[in-house]
């Protein structure tokens, strides 16, 4: 698939870029999984979670670059958007593969993705422990 992509787009795929893309895509998937897990934990606590899910989807599409490219936003807002986990999930892997992200920023973005993974995992761990202490179980 990557060879076909390279042929169609004309972008030469160097091994470092492919490895960076694979790492970034896996980290993006992990961030997405952790958000899904967190939303699942929230559904245990709250009866009506649909509004939170809709809000999450809206943020993901807006700040992930699905609705509008990040470059369409004002420069000050762009600087904030690139720090969000939504950008780390969607835009970073595609920017690496399409060579839109300069090589000197790839490592920074991979580190930012790792930061989001660690932060979400830590928050989930703490929230889950607190949630399970107050949960009531019924049945056998």
Regions inferred by a protein language model and the residue ranges of each:
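Alpha-helical transmembrane segments and their short interhelical loops
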Residues: 1-53, 107-115, 119-122
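Helix-loop junctions at the membrane-solvent interface of multi-pass transporters
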Residues: 6-8, 67, 97, 126
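Transmembrane alpha-helical segments that form the membrane-embedded catalytic/substrate-channel core
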Residues: 29-41, 62-67, 71, 122-131
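Transmembrane helix segments
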Residues: 39, 44-96
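Membrane-interface alpha-helices
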Residues: 94-106
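Junction motif at the cytosolic side of a transmembrane helix
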Residues: 97, 114-140
């Amino acid at each position: 698939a990557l060879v076909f992509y390279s042929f169609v787009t004309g972008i030469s795929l160097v091994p470092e870029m492919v490895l960076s893309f694979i790492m970034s895509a896996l980290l993006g998937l992990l961030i997405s999984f952790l958000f899904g897990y967190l939303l699942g934990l929230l559904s245990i606590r709250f009866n009506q979670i649909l509004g939170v899910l809709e809000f999450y989807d809206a943020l993901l599409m807006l700040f992930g670059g699905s609705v509008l490219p990040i470059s369409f936003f004002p420069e000050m807002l762009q600087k904030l958007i690139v720090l969000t986990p939504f950008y780390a999930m969607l835009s970073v892997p595609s920017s690496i593969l399409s060579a839109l992200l300069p090589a000197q920023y790839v490592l920074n973005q991979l580190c930012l993705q790792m930061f989001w993974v660690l932060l979400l995992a830590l928050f989930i761990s703490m929230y889950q422990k607190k949630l399970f202490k107050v949960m009531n179980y019924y049945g056998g």
